[in-house]
């Protein structure tokens, strides 16, 4: 089976990047599937987690972050140009690979992935609570930018619900936020951390892990 993962880059040391890398490695190494990683803007950045040699990595060299250097109106123009460039390159690679499954993420071009004209089933993973998705960490308090972000999010979520073959969330609560969809699956994150010893529980230290940062 041919499986394509589409993401912006595996350059940050984050939970989402680790999980995606673990999945791709597992599907390629253990199940023997043909796995492809298509990134938009990996560039010369090293992969933040080890990727199996059996996973083929294709970078489309479309640096979306460059649009945010411009004022809002110019952002729209530059953003449209980058989107068009990325869409054409992605469609070309999909035609060449002819995959059975394409997996995307709600944080990156999920609406475009869902509407690709090909035989592949489109699976969209939601690694964040829906109401917090697509909110940039450096978000500026601007009325017009807020309106733009809300519209883009609405459009993306509408298309994901309409065109995706399946939505994968991490928790029951996340799944409920998507409302009525014929094919929602709840798959918690896995861990590949190899623990050699069991804690004695004597150290006066508490570690808390959370997903919501806004």
Which positions does each model-derived feature cover?
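Active-site proximal beta-strand in glycosyltransferases
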Residues: 3, 101-103, 116-137, 147, ...
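N-terminal strand-loop element at the rim of the active site
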Residues: 5-13, 26, 30-77, 177
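Histidine-centered beta-alpha loop that forms part of the nucleotide-sugar donor binding/catalytic region
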Residues: 8, 62, 106-107, 126-130, ...
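Nucleotide-sugar-dependent glycosyltransferase donor-binding/catalytic pocket residues
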Residues: 12, 192, 211-214
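Membrane-proximal helix-turn-helix segments that form the acceptor-binding/catalytic region
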Residues: 88-92, 130-132, 144-166
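Short N-terminal targeting/anchoring amphipathic segment
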Residues: 90-109, 123
